[in-house]
Amino acid sequence: GAFATGHLISLADEWSSVNARLKQASQSSDEFASSQKVLMDISQRTGTAFSDNAALFARSAASMREYGYSADDVLKVTEAISTGLKISGASTAEAGSVITQFSQALAQGVLRGEEFNSVNESGDRIVRALAAGMGVARKDLKAMADDGKLTADKVVPALISQLGILRDEYAAMPETVSSSITKVENAFMAWVGGANEA
């Protein structure tokens, strides 16, 4: 069953490894604690995997700091991506893929090529939010991506500007069984991980 010993051990291991990456991406123990809490809140609100959200934060934090963004900005972008994926109806696998591609784009400082295509295919709502936030037509984004014009300093504020709208849209949607299950898994992983650290 779901609570078999092997599963418990793998959840505890996943919690440890995700949080180790989160610690490395944080500038202090206070920032780590607050980021961990906000990421869990985002995960539970959107029914997305804590591991995926923490990975997006951990992978993009360093590069976003180089552009002068704070941990709070990284958390807002993470929430915009997660919420956009849920509104888009992305599967867990698709969401994981988009999160990986998007964090790679942020690490490089530009969203283009394969990374843009991945977000465009599975994250329709993210792309529409990006277009709205940048004040351009959605159809123009592909050409901008090809020209290397979707730089982090444009993409990040554009997505953050749409967060309120994304939150409202998501709040109006009925909850799915899969997001309920993900919420239980997130909470259980935190509990197992916490018990394991005690």
Task: Please provide the spans of the model-predicted regions.
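ATP-dependent adenylate-handling ligase core
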Residues: 69
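Structural motif
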Residues: 50, 89-96
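Hydrophobic, low-dielectric interface segments
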Residues: 162-198
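Small-residue helix-packing and pore-constriction motifs in hydrophobic alpha-helices
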Residues: 1-46, 55-66, 76-87, 97-146, ...
